[in-house]
Swiss-Prot record:
Name of the protein this chain belongs to: Phosphoribosylaminoimidazole-succinocarboxamide synthase
Keywords: ATP-binding, Ligase, Nucleotide-binding, Purine biosynthesis
Primary enzyme class: ligase
Enzyme Commission numbers on file: 6.3.2.6
UniProt superkingdom: Bacteria
Pfam families: SAICAR_synt
Chain segments annotated as transmembrane: none
């Protein structure tokens, strides 16, 4: 189904954003595109957009039930979401509960090491630069966020982790790490934006001890493990089984 929408405002690797009749809201279309390594690796995966849209809707509503503000308004169709219009902050927040990925490549920390408290990393959102890791001094030099806003961003990200980590554990999933995009709405409120899905979270099946079989996230695509849509579908099934039906704005 193609919804009635306004002009295309932005197209990213996984979503298209369109104007809507309400100037404080936009329509987000989740695409079937799969990308990795800053879009150097690409593929089309049927049903990926639908699965990520439905998972994100459930998780945004979960966060809101715990008092965490998000840009989410509701779903308009299987692959379409209505969200508040926000100014996305060009800093990506990554929360790491378990050491893996780039952390293990860049440090001597062993794969699978539990991180308590969770490690919070900040990255500058710029594909051309490879989304570099930021230091305190570089954040101050760039001047993209004030010290006060940065503190709010970090506090909000840790609140998200405090909700998602036990939620996924109850579903038999380990929330290894995840990335967040945050934005400011027209009232200046800081909101969780973008999406929360296996594209943005590393999720391991707690019932599996096999290092590859347990992966239920985008690493299946990155590492050519196959079964990407089956893994996303399993996450969607578990999440939807634990959440009410998402709000419908269609």
């Amino acid at each position: 189904m193609t919804l009635s929408h306004g002009e295309l405002l932005y197209e990213g690797k996984a979503k298209r954003i369109y104007a809507s009749a309400d100037d404080q809201q936009v329509l987000v279309e989740f695409k079937n595109d799969a990308t990795a390594f800053n879009a150097q690796k690409k593929a089309q995966l049927e049903h990926k957009g639908r699965l990520n849209c439905q998972i994100s809707a459930c998780l945004f509503e979960l966060l809101e039930r715990h008092g965490i503000p998000t840009h989410y308004v509701g779903v308009a169709d299987a692959t379409w979401m209505v969200v508040q219009r926000v100014e996305v902050i060009p800093i990506e927040v990554v929360l790491r509960n378990t050491a893996t990925g780039s952390l293990c490549r860049e440090t001597p920390i062993p794969q699978g090491t539990a991180l308590d408290p969770a490690l919070l990393d900040l990255y500058y959102k710029d594909d051309a630069l490879g989304d570099p890791l930021l230091t305190d001094a570089r954040i101050a030099l760039l001047g993209v966020v004030s010290a006060e806003l940065r503190q709010r961003m970090e506090a909000l990200a840790r609140q998200v982790n405090a909700v998602l980590q036990p939620f996924f554990k109850d579903l038999g999933l380990q929330l290894v790490d995840f990335k967040l995009e945050l934005g400011l709405n027209q009232a200046g409120e800081l909101l969780v934006a973008d999406e929360i899905s296996p594209d943005t979270c590393r999720l391991w099946d707690l019932s599996s001890t096999d290092a590859n079989e347990r992966i239920l996230d985008k690493d299946r695509f990155r590492k050519d493990l196959g079964g990407v849509i089956e893994a996303y579908g399993e996450v969607c099934k578990r999440v939807q089984g634990a959440c009410p039906q998402p709000r419908n704005c269609g």
